[in-house]
A protein has these predicted regions:
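Glycine-rich, basic loop-to-helix element that forms the pyrophosphate-binding segment
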Residues: 42-58
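Short aromatic/hydrophobic "clamp" motif used to bind/position activated sugar donors
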Residues: 63
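Acidic donor-binding loop at a coil-to-helix junction in glycosyltransferase catalytic cores
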Residues: 143-152
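Non-catalytic, C-terminal membrane-associated alpha-helical segments of glycosyltransferases
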Residues: 178-243
Length: 243
Protein backbone atom coordinates (compact mmCIF):
# COMPACT_ATOMS: atom_id res chain seq x y z
CA UNK A 1 0.00 0.00 0.00
CA UNK A 2 1.18 3.60 -0.62
CA UNK A 3 2.62 5.49 2.32
CA UNK A 4 -0.25 7.20 4.13
CA UNK A 5 1.44 10.13 5.88
CA UNK A 6 1.37 13.35 3.89
CA UNK A 7 2.67 16.58 5.37
CA UNK A 8 0.81 18.93 3.02
CA UNK A 9 -2.45 16.90 2.91
CA UNK A 10 -2.30 16.71 -0.90
CA UNK A 11 -2.71 13.17 -2.19
CA UNK A 12 -1.65 12.56 -5.78
CA UNK A 13 -2.51 9.51 -7.89
CA UNK A 14 0.17 8.15 -10.23
CA UNK A 15 -0.16 7.04 -13.85
CA UNK A 16 2.59 4.74 -15.14
CA UNK A 17 2.17 3.70 -18.80
CA UNK A 18 4.16 0.60 -19.76
CA UNK A 19 4.30 -1.80 -22.68
CA UNK A 20 4.53 -4.90 -20.52
CA UNK A 21 4.92 -5.44 -16.78
CA UNK A 22 5.68 -2.21 -14.95
CA UNK A 23 9.23 -1.47 -13.81
CA UNK A 24 9.31 -3.14 -10.36
CA UNK A 25 11.86 -0.71 -8.93
CA UNK A 26 9.77 2.31 -9.92
CA UNK A 27 6.59 0.71 -8.61
CA UNK A 28 8.27 0.02 -5.26
CA UNK A 29 9.39 3.65 -5.07
CA UNK A 30 5.88 4.94 -5.76
CA UNK A 31 4.19 2.59 -3.30
CA UNK A 32 6.44 3.90 -0.55
CA UNK A 33 6.34 7.56 -1.57
CA UNK A 34 4.83 10.05 0.82
CA UNK A 35 1.57 11.59 -0.48
CA UNK A 36 1.12 8.91 -3.19
CA UNK A 37 -2.45 7.78 -3.84
CA UNK A 38 -3.40 4.93 -6.16
CA UNK A 39 -0.98 3.77 -8.86
CA UNK A 40 -2.58 3.30 -12.27
CA UNK A 41 -0.50 1.10 -14.57
CA UNK A 42 -1.87 1.25 -18.11
CA UNK A 43 -0.85 -0.68 -21.23
CA UNK A 44 -2.78 1.36 -23.81
CA UNK A 45 -1.07 2.20 -27.09
CA UNK A 46 0.26 4.60 -28.19
CA UNK A 47 1.81 6.32 -25.18
CA UNK A 48 -0.07 9.60 -25.72
CA UNK A 49 -3.43 7.79 -25.44
CA UNK A 50 -2.23 5.80 -22.43
CA UNK A 51 -1.38 9.00 -20.60
CA UNK A 52 -4.77 10.59 -21.18
CA UNK A 53 -6.85 7.53 -20.31
CA UNK A 54 -4.72 6.83 -17.26
CA UNK A 55 -5.09 10.35 -15.87
CA UNK A 56 -8.86 10.28 -16.35
CA UNK A 57 -8.99 7.13 -14.19
CA UNK A 58 -7.42 9.05 -11.31
CA UNK A 59 -9.44 10.46 -8.42
CA UNK A 60 -7.14 13.27 -7.30
CA UNK A 61 -7.07 16.92 -8.40
CA UNK A 62 -3.41 16.60 -9.37
CA UNK A 63 -2.09 13.46 -11.07
CA UNK A 64 1.52 12.40 -11.56
CA UNK A 65 2.51 10.95 -14.95
CA UNK A 66 5.75 9.00 -14.80
CA UNK A 67 7.20 7.00 -17.68
CA UNK A 68 8.10 3.38 -17.02
CA UNK A 69 11.80 4.01 -17.67
CA UNK A 70 12.14 6.51 -14.80
CA UNK A 71 13.37 6.24 -11.21
CA UNK A 72 12.38 8.82 -8.58
CA UNK A 73 13.75 9.80 -5.16
CA UNK A 74 11.57 9.27 -2.09
CA UNK A 75 10.86 13.00 -1.69
CA UNK A 76 10.04 13.65 -5.37
CA UNK A 77 6.30 14.15 -4.92
CA UNK A 78 6.60 16.37 -1.87
CA UNK A 79 9.22 18.52 -3.62
CA UNK A 80 7.15 18.92 -6.79
CA UNK A 81 3.84 19.68 -5.06
CA UNK A 82 5.50 22.51 -3.14
CA UNK A 83 5.79 24.36 -6.47
CA UNK A 84 2.01 24.32 -7.11
CA UNK A 85 0.36 27.72 -7.54
CA UNK A 86 -3.08 28.67 -8.90
CA UNK A 87 -1.55 29.67 -12.25
CA UNK A 88 0.39 26.45 -12.88
CA UNK A 89 -1.12 23.56 -14.85
CA UNK A 90 1.79 21.12 -14.99
CA UNK A 91 5.16 20.71 -13.30
CA UNK A 92 8.06 18.58 -14.54
CA UNK A 93 11.61 18.10 -13.28
CA UNK A 94 14.98 17.84 -14.99
CA UNK A 95 16.16 14.22 -14.99
CA UNK A 96 19.67 12.85 -15.28
CA UNK A 97 20.17 10.27 -18.03
CA UNK A 98 21.47 6.77 -17.41
CA UNK A 99 22.69 6.80 -21.02
CA UNK A 100 26.23 8.10 -20.56
CA UNK A 101 26.38 9.78 -23.98
CA UNK A 102 23.22 11.84 -23.52
CA UNK A 103 24.15 12.51 -19.90
CA UNK A 104 27.49 13.94 -21.04
CA UNK A 105 25.78 16.23 -23.55
CA UNK A 106 23.30 17.58 -21.01
CA UNK A 107 26.07 17.97 -18.43
CA UNK A 108 28.00 20.17 -20.86
CA UNK A 109 24.92 22.22 -21.81
CA UNK A 110 24.08 22.59 -18.13
CA UNK A 111 27.39 24.31 -17.48
CA UNK A 112 26.36 27.23 -19.69
CA UNK A 113 22.57 27.23 -19.38
CA UNK A 114 20.03 26.25 -16.73
CA UNK A 115 18.43 23.04 -18.06
CA UNK A 116 15.14 23.82 -16.31
CA UNK A 117 14.86 26.98 -18.44
CA UNK A 118 15.27 25.28 -21.83
CA UNK A 119 12.04 25.80 -23.77
CA UNK A 120 12.69 22.74 -25.95
CA UNK A 121 12.31 20.09 -23.22
CA UNK A 122 9.12 20.03 -21.09
CA UNK A 123 10.30 16.86 -19.26
CA UNK A 124 6.99 15.10 -19.76
CA UNK A 125 8.48 11.84 -18.47
CA UNK A 126 8.07 12.93 -14.83
CA UNK A 127 5.36 15.52 -14.22
CA UNK A 128 2.28 16.31 -12.19
CA UNK A 129 -0.72 17.81 -13.95
CA UNK A 130 -4.18 19.07 -13.09
CA UNK A 131 -6.54 16.21 -13.87
CA UNK A 132 -9.18 18.52 -15.36
CA UNK A 133 -6.79 19.58 -18.13
CA UNK A 134 -6.87 16.07 -19.60
CA UNK A 135 -10.64 16.08 -20.06
CA UNK A 136 -10.56 18.13 -23.29
CA UNK A 137 -7.10 17.10 -24.45
CA UNK A 138 -7.06 15.45 -27.89
CA UNK A 139 -3.61 13.84 -28.06
CA UNK A 140 -1.90 12.98 -31.32
CA UNK A 141 -1.44 9.22 -31.67
CA UNK A 142 2.26 9.25 -30.86
CA UNK A 143 4.71 7.13 -28.93
CA UNK A 144 7.51 9.70 -29.21
CA UNK A 145 7.33 13.45 -29.69
CA UNK A 146 4.20 14.38 -27.73
CA UNK A 147 6.10 16.65 -25.34
CA UNK A 148 5.84 20.01 -27.09
CA UNK A 149 2.29 19.39 -28.32
CA UNK A 150 1.12 18.66 -24.78
CA UNK A 151 2.96 21.65 -23.33
CA UNK A 152 1.34 24.00 -25.86
CA UNK A 153 -2.08 22.55 -25.05
CA UNK A 154 -1.63 23.23 -21.32
CA UNK A 155 -0.47 26.78 -22.04
CA UNK A 156 -3.45 27.42 -24.33
CA UNK A 157 -5.79 26.59 -21.44
CA UNK A 158 -4.33 29.59 -19.63
CA UNK A 159 -2.07 27.67 -17.25
CA UNK A 160 1.71 27.79 -17.05
CA UNK A 161 4.04 24.84 -17.58
CA UNK A 162 6.85 24.83 -15.01
CA UNK A 163 10.07 22.81 -14.99
CA UNK A 164 12.01 22.40 -11.75
CA UNK A 165 15.77 21.82 -11.53
CA UNK A 166 17.16 18.34 -10.92
CA UNK A 167 15.54 16.77 -7.84
CA UNK A 168 16.92 13.26 -8.26
CA UNK A 169 14.87 11.79 -11.12
CA UNK A 170 16.76 9.35 -13.34
CA UNK A 171 15.87 8.49 -16.94
CA UNK A 172 16.98 4.96 -17.72
CA UNK A 173 17.28 5.84 -21.37
CA UNK A 174 14.97 3.69 -23.47
CA UNK A 175 16.29 3.86 -27.03
CA UNK A 176 14.37 6.25 -29.28
CA UNK A 177 13.99 6.51 -33.02
CA UNK A 178 15.10 10.06 -33.74
CA UNK A 179 13.86 9.90 -37.33
CA UNK A 180 10.35 9.45 -35.91
CA UNK A 181 10.93 12.29 -33.45
CA UNK A 182 12.11 14.58 -36.26
CA UNK A 183 8.97 13.75 -38.26
CA UNK A 184 6.73 14.46 -35.26
CA UNK A 185 8.44 17.76 -34.46
CA UNK A 186 7.81 18.97 -38.02
CA UNK A 187 4.32 17.49 -38.45
CA UNK A 188 2.92 18.89 -35.22
CA UNK A 189 4.71 22.22 -35.37
CA UNK A 190 6.89 21.66 -32.31
CA UNK A 191 9.80 23.50 -33.92
CA UNK A 192 9.79 26.39 -36.33
CA UNK A 193 12.81 26.98 -38.55
CA UNK A 194 14.45 29.18 -35.90
CA UNK A 195 14.29 26.48 -33.22
CA UNK A 196 15.55 23.88 -35.66
CA UNK A 197 18.59 26.00 -36.54
CA UNK A 198 19.17 26.73 -32.86
CA UNK A 199 19.02 23.03 -32.03
CA UNK A 200 21.38 22.02 -34.82
CA UNK A 201 23.85 24.78 -33.90
CA UNK A 202 23.83 23.77 -30.24
CA UNK A 203 24.34 20.11 -31.12
CA UNK A 204 27.19 20.98 -33.46
CA UNK A 205 28.90 23.11 -30.78
CA UNK A 206 28.37 20.95 -27.70
CA UNK A 207 28.71 17.41 -29.10
CA UNK A 208 32.55 17.54 -29.28
CA UNK A 209 32.72 18.82 -25.69
CA UNK A 210 30.41 16.02 -24.55
CA UNK A 211 32.71 13.48 -26.20
CA UNK A 212 35.70 15.14 -24.56
CA UNK A 213 34.08 15.04 -21.13
CA UNK A 214 33.61 11.28 -21.54
CA UNK A 215 36.97 10.85 -23.24
CA UNK A 216 35.05 8.83 -25.80
CA UNK A 217 34.91 8.92 -29.59
CA UNK A 218 31.86 6.67 -29.28
CA UNK A 219 30.01 9.51 -27.54
CA UNK A 220 30.75 11.81 -30.47
CA UNK A 221 29.45 9.34 -33.05
CA UNK A 222 26.43 8.37 -30.96
CA UNK A 223 25.28 11.97 -30.56
CA UNK A 224 26.07 12.79 -34.19
CA UNK A 225 23.95 9.83 -35.29
CA UNK A 226 20.98 11.12 -33.26
CA UNK A 227 21.38 14.59 -34.74
CA UNK A 228 21.48 13.25 -38.30
CA UNK A 229 18.44 11.03 -37.67
CA UNK A 230 16.43 13.94 -36.25
CA UNK A 231 17.29 16.17 -39.21
CA UNK A 232 16.52 13.34 -41.65
CA UNK A 233 13.07 12.90 -40.12
CA UNK A 234 12.42 16.64 -40.30
CA UNK A 235 13.46 16.82 -43.97
CA UNK A 236 11.49 13.67 -44.82
CA UNK A 237 8.32 15.25 -43.47
CA UNK A 238 8.93 18.46 -45.47
CA UNK A 239 9.34 16.38 -48.65
CA UNK A 240 6.07 14.55 -47.94
CA UNK A 241 4.33 17.90 -47.42
CA UNK A 242 5.41 19.00 -50.89
CA UNK A 243 4.15 15.87 -52.66
Amino acid sequence: MPASRCDNDLKVDFVVPSRDAANPTLMHQLKNMQCAGQIINTHEKPLSIARKKGVLQADTEWVAMVDDDMLLPANWLQSVTKAITPKIGAIGTVAVHKNKHIAAYERVVGTVYNLSKLDTNPHINNIIIRRKLMENYDPPRLFFGEDQYFKRYVQKTGFAWKVLPFLGATHLGTSKNYVTIGISYRRYGHFGFYKLVRRMAARFIFTPFAALSNLSVKTFWYLTKLNVEFLAGWVKEIVLEKL
